């Protein structure tokens, strides 16, 4: 799936009603538009890089990713993810507990 030519693509690898596993790729200057996570989730970075996170309240931060080092976020997170300064794709797997 391409998020309307925003430079981000997603591929659902598994959705069994308990977990949804999605591989995301954000190209240089690409963005995953503002979205809300309805479920608790784990992110498994496949690259060592950084991405920009803009939250719904307007605050922003840089998330440093290390390949293979997972992190989790609570349900309700609402943000936009981008790769504005990247020269390579940012790639990660997102695992949602449905």
Region roles according to the model:
Residues 31, 50, 69-70:
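Residue-level marker of beta-strand positions
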